[in-house]
């Protein structure tokens, strides 16, 4: 008889011990002073760090620190207590909270939004000169995203034999678009990852209307039929890329962001800078693969495990190779980024998203105001008993025939139950989903623990932490530091009682070998 495997136990993460936390705690105030003075972009007071960026770094320095408050959990069997520190719930800076948000988004989309149908990822990247405009203007970014989704819908309709004779007004796609504002080397790189159900949804009348009783049927009694696509290959992607290239450039010219002659030049480029990829497709039965894809699309811009220290500098290992300027103008490929602590903080600060800005958006039948959303998202749950409706033959991502997960048509019930809104995922459930460790498991008896109190008053926090022998003071945050003192016989002059000023010309930065506009060239 095999012994039962001992469950994994949850341990506090102690962010103050990580390299990123120590770097931010030591250099954040200095970076704020230098960034406000235009040290990094040369714009001075015109580019003072935004208040939400300051707040993101300040909240990160409090995240996971017991001295700033915690929750108390107790085991109902043996009475053992544990403390769980509060989190900042920030976006962009804190790796732990960004990971939690990533897992929660992927779990919600996988469990409650995407039906059990094939899902394909479409990725669009545009030239650098267009990225700059999209990064600074949300209306331009929305325009490009709408063009991308319309071209995807047209491409799917063209490769959908089952919807060839259908009314175009009743054909819809189902998609969730993720807006990435970052690249793999901590650079500003606006591009789109769109997860699209690999097929077309057709809006059809409900069962009452099909039986001839549409006179007294409710207008919302609609059904939906799914038609799969075939032939999404490299030729289809190339045609889609060429269409996007023309339409996006035409839209930029129409908005006055590009001249007509500039658009003609960009259309004539051999390497246009436009890139479309649709090679990743998840089968209908592979729900774990779909969740991994959604985590990749919802990932944060910074991965703490890729950061290491090399002397006085920091080295960040990039997921992909990037180009560095070289003397032959061809660029040298590198997969590691060497930065000073201030440069690292400045790059992370540029990637902090503004507040109340959506990181992903819903389109087609998955849009919140779509009348077909309830019928489509109901298929995201685990499959129930097989229905007697006729199943339309379909194809999977690889092109093999198989039974359609949806009949034709699928109509709602006469008295559908009121929709139940999906609850927020609990912190303990997300921890278990990521690390396969349930945090509210008693380390002594293995019993179930529950939260019994939230400690927020500073006096109570210090009393409890001092009682258990933990540090009751938060980690030290270094104040802003000025430039170093120069020692070119200044001590001798000071010894004579003469007050002298340092030679500020020695602190000037050397003239660069080449001029680079960092706002455009990533």
Task: Show which residues each predicted segment covers.
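Beta->alpha loop/short-helix hinge microenvironment recognizer with preference
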Residues: 1-522
């Amino acid at each position: 008889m095999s012994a039962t495997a001992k469950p994994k136990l949850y341990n506090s993460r102690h962010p103050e011990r990580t390299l990123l936390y120590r770097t931010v705690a030591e250099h954040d105030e200095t970076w704020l002073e230098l960034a406000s003075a235009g040290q990094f972009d040369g714009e001075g007071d015109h580019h003072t760090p935004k208040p939400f960026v300051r707040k993101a770094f300040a909240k990160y320095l409090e995240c996971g620190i017991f001295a700033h408050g915690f929750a108390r959990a107790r085991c109902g069997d043996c009475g053992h207590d544990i403390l769980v520190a509060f989190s900042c719930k920030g976006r962009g800076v804190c790796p732990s909270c960004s990971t939690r948000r990533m897992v929660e988004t992927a779990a919600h989309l996988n469990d409650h939004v995407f039906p059990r149908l094939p899902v394909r990822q479409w990725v669009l990247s545009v030239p650098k000169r267009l990225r700059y405009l999209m990064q600074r203007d949300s209306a331009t970014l929305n325009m490009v995203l709408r063009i991308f989704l319309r071209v995807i819908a047209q491409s799917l309709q063209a490769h959908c034999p089952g919807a060839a004779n259908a009314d175009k007004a009743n054909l819809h796609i189902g998609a969730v678009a993720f807006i990435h504002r970052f690249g793999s080397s901590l650079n500003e790189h606006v591009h789109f990852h769109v997860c699209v159900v690999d097929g077309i949804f057709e809006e059809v009348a409900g069962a009452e209307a099909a039986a001839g009783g549409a006179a007294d049927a409710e207008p919302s009694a609609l059904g939906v039929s799914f038609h799969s696509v075939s032939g999404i290959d490299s030729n289809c992607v190339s045609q889609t890329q060429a269409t996007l290239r023309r339409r996006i450039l035409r839209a930029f010219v129409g908005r006055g962001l590009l001249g007509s002659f500039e658009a003609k030049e960009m259309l004539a480029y051999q390497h246009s800078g436009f890139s479309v990829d649709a090679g990743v497709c998840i089968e209908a039965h592979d729900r774990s693969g779909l969740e991994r894809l959604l985590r990749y699309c919802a990932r944060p811009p910074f991965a703490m495990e890729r950061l290491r220290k090399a002397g006085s500098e920091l080295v960040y290992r990039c997921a992909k190779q990037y180009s560095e300027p070289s003397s032959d103008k061809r660029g040298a490929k590198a997969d590691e980024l060497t930065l000073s602590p201030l440069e690292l903080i400045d790059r992370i600060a540029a990637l902090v998203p503004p507040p109340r800005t959506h990181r992903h958006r819903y389109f087609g039948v998955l849009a919140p105001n779509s009348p077909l959303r309830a019928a489509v998202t109901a298929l995201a749950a685990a499959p129930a008993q097989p229905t007697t409706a006729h199943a339309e033959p379909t194809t999977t991502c690889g092109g093999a025939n198989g039974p359609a997960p949806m009949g034709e048509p699928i109509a709602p019930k006469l008295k559908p139950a009121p929709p139940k809104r999906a609850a927020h995922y609990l912190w303990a459930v997300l921890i278990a989903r990521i690390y396969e460790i349930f945090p509210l498991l008693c380390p002594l008896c293995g019993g179930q623990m529950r939260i019994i109190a939230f400690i927020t008053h500073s006096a109570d926090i210090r009393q409890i932490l001092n009682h258990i022998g933990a540090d009751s003071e938060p980690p030290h945050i270094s104040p802003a530091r000025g430039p170093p003192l120069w020692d070119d016989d200044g001590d001798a002059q000071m010894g004579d009682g003469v007050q002298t000023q340092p030679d500020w010309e020695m602190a000037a930065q050397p003239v660069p070998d080449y001029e680079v506009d960092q706002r455009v060239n990533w």
